[in-house]
């Protein structure tokens, strides 16, 4: 995932998980000062949990649940990259490797203090895909994918004699 140089690093505590790639949290500014902010995970997108498409909703709710599970371990690190088009802080979230619950892939971004990127974990586990802020991918359910594959098989196969 391509990243801009980090602006700032903060410790955060969870207030609420909105979906698989957005949270509300308290950001510790130091000197006993905390501010509540909405954080949009930089460089990834997850499927929507509030949609009429039932298949997409299932994937969206799974991403939201995994995001919550990773963050409930306690304090996490936020590396901020400024604000996005909707005024949310764009950031990468880092947690303790213990929060992940399984062996961590080598392609997961790690901070200098050994924390691991939730953004990368969500991609590696199939809960998210890389996203550069442009046009979003349209969700295609597994059923639609299977139907399309079967249709291609019928078209590609020569007629039997």
Task: Indicate residue ranges for each PLM-predicted region.
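Small beta-barrel nucleic-acid-binding modules, primarily SNase/OB-fold domains
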Residues: 1-161
